[in-house]
Curated annotation (Swiss-Prot):
It is found in: Cell membrane. This is A-type ATP synthase subunit C. Component of the A-type ATP synthase that produces ATP from ADP in the presence of a proton gradient across the membrane. Gene3D superfamilies: ATP synthase (C/AC39) subunit, domain 3, V-type ATP synthase subunit C domain. Its main location: membrane. It comes from the Archaea. The lineage of its organism: Archaea, Methanobacteriati, Methanobacteriota, Stenosarchaea group, Halobacteria. Keywords: ATP synthesis, Cell membrane, Hydrogen ion transport, Ion transport, Membrane, Transport. Belongs to the V-ATPase V0D/AC39 subunit family. NCBIfam families: AhaC, PRK01198.1-1. GO terms for cellular component: plasma membrane; proton-transporting V-type ATPase, V0 domain. GO terms for biological process: proton motive force-driven plasma membrane ATP synthesis. It comes from Haloferax volcanii (strain ATCC 29605 / DSM 3757 / JCM 8879 / NBRC 14742 / NCIMB 2012 / VKM B-1768 / DS2) (Halobacterium volcanii). Coiled coil: none annotated.
């Protein structure tokens, strides 16, 4: 890896496509949903997760083993990409991988809010961003949310969280804090992003991700029951929505889907839009948005094969694989029917 000099997209994309071909598909998922946690762990041991399952097998078992192995493998895969990348390409990928810093911050905050144990929170952390082990340990050691805000002062999340904490204390829900984390992440992604040929499609993808994040946030707020205005939590940088229209769209999913279908995204989304129209719950709608974003990234990657978007597309696809396997393991441990679990997966 080098942060200076020229980029090397051809080399990195070739490596990433080889990794993409090793991701689980329909056949593997059909097998997994009919296995118990111990069988799932053994299945993973014969796949790309072999090293992690073997390394962790003496300390963990069942769903705990699966989750720790998934998160360690995810971090390794993305750190490998950074090791391969040079120059501007490295910078673009590193910025995007800060999404896992954002994920970890929100996971710790949610854990404190819900009263989860340190072990439960740690099992959900993904060490693929810029936070080092010392900072993550300090976050895990925090006994209350205000302490997390203090620990993060000096990071890209510090100022936004400090400003949002007072509102959180007033409303008693996590929306202000989580939105502050998301805003900080997307602001640093777009900050000083020079739209040359290498970054043009990358910016188009980021705009789509922000648009879908705004849609997701508005729906969550509308269904939270809290006295919150979606306009106050609008994230700048997208192209599809105006802040003032989100409140009305959030109460009418059909209009929201129509807005997406009639936009530039409609031409590049097919199955995902049908899933959005068929979604009958917030969870179902969010799952369909995940699938739509993945399909959009895939399409950009095919149209512009030497841009950064095939790499971002792989990052999303790998995340979905980890989410799917985790959902299967937790569902099987809870005794859910295989068909019910399969319906919850995001597969393209």
């Amino acid at each position: 890896m080098s942060t200076t000099g020229g980029s090397n997209p051809e080399y990195v994309i070739a490596r990433v496509r080889a990794r993409r071909s090793a991701l689980f598909g329909d056949e593997e998922y059909r097998k997994l949903v009919r296995m118990g946690p111990a069988e799932i762990a053994r299945f993973m041991e014969e796949s790309e997760y072999e090293a992690e399952v073997n390394a962790l097998g003496s300390r963990f078992s069942g769903v705990d083993l699966i989750e720790y192995a998934l998160n360690q493998n995810l971090a390794k895969q993305f750190n490998d990409i950074l090791d391969w990348a040079d120059g501007r390409l490295y910078d673009l990928i590193a910025r995007y991988l800060r999404k896992f810093d954002a994920w970890n911050v929100k996971t710790v905050i949610r854990g404190l809010y819900s009263g989860a144990s340190r072990e439960e929170v740690e099992s959900d952390l993904i060490r693929a961003g810029e936070f080092d082990d010392r900072l993550i340990s300090r976050l895990l050691d925090a006994g209350e949310i205000e302490e997390v805000v203090s620990v993060l002062s000096g990071t890209i999340f510090g100022d936004g969280l400090a400003a949002a904490y007072e509102e959180y204390e007033e409303v008693g829900v996590l929306v202000p804090l989580e939105n502050a984390v998301d805003r900080a992440f997307y602001e640093q992604l777009l900050d000083d992003l020079v739209v040359g040929e290498e970054a043009k499609q990358y910016r188009e993808f980021l705009e789509a991700e922000i648009d879908f994040r705004n849609a997701r946030n508005a729906l969550r707020i509308a269904r939270s029951g809290a006295d919150l205005d979606p306009v106050d939590y609008f994230i700048e940088g997208g192209t599809l929505f105006r802040a003032t229209e989100l409140a009305s769209l959030a109460t009418s999913p059909d209009e929201l889907v129509s807005k997406i279908r009639d936009s530039r995204y409609g031409d590049r989304l097919s199955a995902a839009l049908s899933d959005l129209e068929a979604a009958d719950s917030l969870i179902g709608f969010e799952r369909a948005l995940d699938a739509a974003l993945l399909e959009y990234a895939d399409t950009l990657g095919y149209v512009f094969p030497l841009s950064v978007t095939p790499i971002v597309s792989y990052i999303l696809a790998k995340e979905r694989e980890v989410d799917n396997i985790r959902a299967i393991a937790r569902g099987r441990e809870a005794g859910l029917d295989p068909d019910a679990i399969e319906a919850e997966l995001v597969i393209l």
